[in-house]
Each structure stands twice: as C-alpha cells, then as structure tokens.
C-alpha cells in the first residue's frame, strides 16, 4: 500500500452528496506565511461538492426550512443569486427531491450558469440591476415565490439567503467548529470576503461561543457591494 494511504479510509461512505459538505482541510499558504512571518492558512472550501463555501449555507437553509415545515415534498425552491449559492441550492434541492428555480444576473459567468443547469434547476436570467432597483434579481425571486404561493399555498420556498439566519447558522455550527478543532483552538485572526455576510457573522458567533479571542476581519474589494455600502451607504 502506498505510504500516503492507510488501512482506514480518510472519509466514511456517505449516503448523500449533502453529507460530503464541510470538513474541508486547512492548507498553509507557504509564500504568504514566509513573507509575513506568520502562519497563514486557507480553508479549502473549493473542495465542497458544489465547489464553494456556499454549499454549507444551501444545506442549512434547506434542512432548516424542512424542520420548520416551510419546505415540503413537491415544493419548488426559489432563490435570487449571483451564482455560487444557486449552485449549492440546486445541488441540495436535487438531492432532497425538490424542484429549483434560480434567478441570476445575466452578466454572471457561463460556468456558473452551466453548473446550475447541470443540477437540474431552472435558470432564469435577468438584467444585472442594483439592489435598490425593484427589478433586482433578489427582489424578483421574492415576487416569484409570493406569486406561486398565492396561486397554490406551499408551492414555493424562497431561500432568501441575505435575510435567512440559517445562512449564518451554517457557519456557526460547522465552519467555526472545524477551524477550532483543526487548530486546537489556537488562532489569532480570521478574515474572509462577504456576499451575504453569513460566513463572517457565523464564524464570529461560533468563535465567541467557544471562547476563542481571534480578531475578525472583513476583506472586500473596492467596488464590491458591502464596501460601497460601508463607505457610501449605497446598496
């Protein structure tokens, strides 16, 4: 047997693709660590089955909605997303037996659109408009779910990642504990970029709950939505 293998599997056999979400490794960033004199680690969220950290939120949103009776067999999962959350939701919806309709800005990459379609979701491309516009993709998703439920109660569930606390809970319950486990609780700081803010808020809450005193930092490029909101108040 090759030296890098053991007699025990690194991961047990899972019963569903959603069970493969999470438990991603921390990888030391060698050049960044050498240049700064610090140990800088990256959490390899690209190793989630849908290819991003958004798989965690997608799973938690769906399981939470099921537990609260908001998402029932035969319903359609609706969301407005710039891409990665849509991929995760399409994957989880397929695994759990739901139809899925994703509204996405038409400017998003072909690769994201193709991935959503490959999971069997219906993709609705809409103009890329700012959040303040009534035809922003998020607001269109909300109206679509509302119209479907008006015609048939319980026909649709709007994931609503930007306001759904299950998004944050995904990271409080999984991302933060994984980091603390793998580092034996020893870390000085955590940084991430944000879209909905779920990762930042959930990891910070998880660290606080565990008594970890790491500094929390938000890194957002100029021109990104949260940077614009922070500096100008524009959404």
Per-region residue spans from a language model:
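PLP-dependent amino-acid enzyme catalytic core
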Residues: 1-235
């Amino acid at each position: 047997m090759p030296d890098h293998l053991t007699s025990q599997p690194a991961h047990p056999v899972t019963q569903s693709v959603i069970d493969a979400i999470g438990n991603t490794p921390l990888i030391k960033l060698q050049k960044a660590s050498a240049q700064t004199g610090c140990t800088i680690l990256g959490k390899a969220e690209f190793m989630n089955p849908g290819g991003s950290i958004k798989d965690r939120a997608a799973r938690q949103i769906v399981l939470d909605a099921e537990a609260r009776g908001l998402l029932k067999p035969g319903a359609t999962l609706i969301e407005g997303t710039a891409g990665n959350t849509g991929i995760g939701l399409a994957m989880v919806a397929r695994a759990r037996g739901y139809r899925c309709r994703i509204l996405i800005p038409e400017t998003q990459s072909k690769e994201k659109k193709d991935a959503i379609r490959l999971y069997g979701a219906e993709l609705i491309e809409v103009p890329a408009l700012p959040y303040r516009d009534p035809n922003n993709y998020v607001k269109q998703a909300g109206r679509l779910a509302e119209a479907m439920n008006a015609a048939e109660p319980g026909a649709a569930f709007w994931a609503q990642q930007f306001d759904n606390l299950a998004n944050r809970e995904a990271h409080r319950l999984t991302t933060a504990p994984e980091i603390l486990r793998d580092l034996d609780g020893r870390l000085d700081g955590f940084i991430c970029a944000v879209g909905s803010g779920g990762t930042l808020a959930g990891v910070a809450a998880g660290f606080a709950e565990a008594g970890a005193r790491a500094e929390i930092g938000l890194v957002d490029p100029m021109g990104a939505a949260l940077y614009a909101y922070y500096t100008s108040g524009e959404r």
